Amino acid sequence: IHYAKRMPSISYAYGLFLNNILVGIVSYGSPVSPSLCKGIAGEINKKKVIELNRLVLKYNKKNEASMLVGKSIKLLPKPKIIVSYADTKQNHVGYIYQATNFLFTGTTKPRTDIAGKNGKHSRHHLGDKTKRVFRSAKHRYIFINANKRERKKLLKQINYQIMEYPKW
């Protein structure tokens, strides 16, 4: 079970099998925020953006995660700009993304969201039945899944600075 405990939008999902038993899954889908798509590489490229939104492994053996991510990217349609996040609250740095040559583009700002009394995120104003829930900073990674020429072109259109990988 994934720690986020919510079902994201899933457009593509790939499994990792060991002796015909599912032991891992990676999924990709539309990012929750349309403004995120536009913010990454502009209006012209917003439909190319997808999010690696879940990665779950039963055993989490050495290199298992990066192998699953790397092989699944090869199965995605091109060109795509893949964005994913490593949650600092979970002590994630993003080593999987670093191992699969994602580009590090900084860390989001911590913030608070409005949630209902049950603690779940709400996009609706619920009056006094709401509370503020802390959302931790996340490391943002992107991967340009395209041929060499398209990749070079898309890299020039990325709106974020490419930075050194974070380490812990």
Question: Predicted segments — roles?
Answer:
Residues 29-133, 143:
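Acyl-donor binding region in acyl/amide transferases
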Residues 11, 136-141:
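Short hydrophobic/aromatic beta-strand or adjacent loop that forms the aromatic wall/cage
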Residues 11-27:
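Conserved beta-hairpin
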Residues 152-168:
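Short, cationic low-complexity segments
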Residues 143-152:
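C-terminal accessory regions of radical SAM enzymes
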Residues 1-9:
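Short amphipathic alpha-helix that is part of the acyltransferase structural core
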